[in-house]
């Protein structure tokens, strides 16, 4: 099984850690009905994109001052469709395993992983207060409100990498290595643009779309990803039975 060594792990959230497609589509459809927008057309562009970009493109007359339109939409998702939200298989175990030294089995003093999502802080943080409560919100957590440029621009992932580098006192390390876990082609492209190894999850797109976007490995879910080694010197990740293009 293929293995690779990294210093940091960077995760998208929706579709990568948490399965939110039904909740997101339900809330967007409701908003589309209220404003006479074709949801089919919106869904061609929405996955992996920041909600504020979708608001500007499809709801130009909706008042989104201070992102209040986005917050209302994503509050609707979190408050009214929580029963449709679930964890991507293997996600919780993978995140928890990244917090433990494999040699001593003790909890590491600092987390080596971060979240980079296109969602709002309200929606993204809410999952760590509900279905990801056992994991807890990581210190480095980049949302769509923290960047000027959304995916496929690498700004979000680059910012998370730099913050982790600082927290872990790795600023002097020249050959820093990192992996990005993503379910959307725009996210895969963002990861590749900042020099990361990329692992695509087929929760939202066919494997061919993820490979075409540049994914180095593609899996069905995170049960196929395991931490072989994790200590102060780095992380060794194993991808079990990765999908192939054929």
UniProtKB/Swiss-Prot annotation:
Mg(2+) binds at residues 83, 183. Its cofactor is Mg(2+). One of its GO terms (cellular component) is cytoplasm. It comes from the Eukaryota. GO terms for biological process: carbohydrate metabolic process; glucose metabolic process. CDD domains: HAD_ScGPP-like. Optimum temperature is 40 degrees Celsius. The active site is at residue 83. The keyword Metal-binding applies. Substrate binds at residues 83, 92, 146-149. Belongs to the HAD-like hydrolase superfamily. DOG/GPP family. Present with 2400 molecules/cell in log phase SD medium. Phosphatase that is active on 2-deoxy-D-glucose 6-phosphate (2-DOG-6P), but not very active on fructose-1-P. This is 2-deoxyglucose-6-phosphate phosphatase 2. The lineage of its organism: Eukaryota, Fungi, Dikarya, Ascomycota, Saccharomycotina. The gene is DOG2.
């Amino acid at each position: 099984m293929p293995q690779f060594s990294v210093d940091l792990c960077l995760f998208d959230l929706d579709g990568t850690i948490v399965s939110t497609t039904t909740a997101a589509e339900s809330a967007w459809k409701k908003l589309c009905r209220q404003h006479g927008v074709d949801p089919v057309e919106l869904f061609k562009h929405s996955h992996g994109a920041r909600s504020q970009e979708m608001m500007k493109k499809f709801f130009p007359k909706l008042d989104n001052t201070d992102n209040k339109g986005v917050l209302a939409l994503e509050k609707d998702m979190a408050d009214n469709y929580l029963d449709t939200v679930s964890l991507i298989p293997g996600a919780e175990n993978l995140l928890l395993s990244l917090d433990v030294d494999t040699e001593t089995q003790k909890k590491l003093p600092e987390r080596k992983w971060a979240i980079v999502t296109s969602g709002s802080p309200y929606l993204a943080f809410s999952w760590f207060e509900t279905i990801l409560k056992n994991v807890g919100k990581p210190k480095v957590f980049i949302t769509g409100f923290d960047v000027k440029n959304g995916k496929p621009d690498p700004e979000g992932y680059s910012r998370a990498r730099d913050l982790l580098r600082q927290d872990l006192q790795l600023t002097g390390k020249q050959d820093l290595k990192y992996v990005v876990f993503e379910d959307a082609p725009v996210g895969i492209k963002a990861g590749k643009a900042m020099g990361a190894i990329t692992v695509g999850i087929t929760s939202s797109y066919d494997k061919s779309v993820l490979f075409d976007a540049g994914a180095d490995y593609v899996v069905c879910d995170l049960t196929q990803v395991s931490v072989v080694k994790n200590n102060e010197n780095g992380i060794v990740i194993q991808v079990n039975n990765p999908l192939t293009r054929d």
